[in-house]
């Protein structure tokens, strides 16, 4: 089993480490996924002193090990470390939602293909198998990550599922069931991860509560009007 060792800048390392934690994927798996993804794509070049920065090392998968040196020659990289550093550099020069799409490229492809062909898919999500009718993929601007909006037959309701949390996916040769087309369009136009569109609650806040509300930057309920304070009700559903 071949081990890859590469020095990256502190900035690059923090992004790679952050994505590993955010998407709950080991850094080695990210390295193998990126190597395979960028085989047929142009790479951005970066020069870095080998003595500076942080070390990243991981074992290549058997599939990647078999083609590693062919790719090294194809990319005209002088060293193994240079090749992987250029791959990492090309990867981090994307916003997080795009990096998510790179890491989970196969999942995105299968979902989009199912939507295009109007067919149902099966997914394993939070350790539970579900049959779903996929409608669209949307990026949450507050979280900078992608969700699949669908109708879940297990729950008999509409759901948003984080694409990065889909553990397995398979196609079903059954036509999508379009349930409540107007609602689907309304959600697409007023998207939020918690499907809070049309749900409102009235909250009376203390001054300390208002300060805490203003500090929240992610998934903060939208302020509708203030007489006290009115906010959208966000309900997390699995």
Role assignments for model-derived ranges:
Residues 1-11, 40-64:
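Short Lys/Arg-rich basic patches
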Residues 9-29, 62-82, 86:
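Surface-exposed, Lys/Arg-rich phosphate-binding patches that contact polyanionic backbones
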Residues 144-149:
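Short aromatic-glycine-enriched beta-strand elements
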Residues 113-125:
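A short, Trp-centered hydrophobic/proline-enriched beta-strand micro-motif
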Residues 130-136:
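Short beta-strand-centered aromatic/proline hotspots
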Residues 150-238:
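Surface-exposed, charged, gly/pro-rich loop-and-adjacent secondary-structure segments at domain edges
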Residues 91-109:
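Amphipathic alpha-helical
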């Amino acid at each position: 089993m071949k081990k890859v060792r590469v020095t990256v800048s502190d900035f690059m390392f923090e992004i790679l480490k952050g994505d590993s934690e955010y998407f709950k994927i080991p850094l080695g798996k990210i390295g193998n996924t990126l190597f395979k993804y960028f085989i047929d794509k142009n790479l951005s070049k970066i020069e870095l002193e080998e003595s500076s920065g942080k070390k990243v090392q991981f074992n290549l998968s058997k599939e990647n090990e078999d083609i590693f040196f062919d790719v090294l020659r194809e990319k005209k990289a002088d060293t193994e470390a240079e090749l992987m550093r250029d791959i990492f550099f090309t990867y981090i020069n994307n916003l997080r939602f795009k990096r998510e799409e790179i890491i989970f490229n196969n999942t995105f492809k299968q979902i989009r293909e199912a939507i295009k062909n109007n067919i149902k898919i099966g997914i394993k999500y939070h350790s539970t198998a579900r049959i779903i009718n996929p409608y669209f993929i949307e990026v949450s601007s507050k979280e900078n990550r992608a969700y699949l909006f669908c109708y879940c037959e297990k729950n008999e309701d509409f759901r948003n599922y984080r694409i990065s949390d889909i553990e397995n996916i398979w196609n079903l040769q059954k036509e999508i069931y379009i349930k409540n087309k107007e609602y689907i369009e309304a959600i697409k136009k007023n998207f939020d991860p918690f499907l809070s569109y049309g749900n409102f609650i009235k909250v009376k806040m203390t001054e300390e509560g208002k300060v805490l509300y203003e500090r929240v930057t992610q998934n903060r309920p939208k302020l509708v009007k203030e007489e006290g304070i009115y906010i959208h009700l966000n309900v997390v559903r699995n």
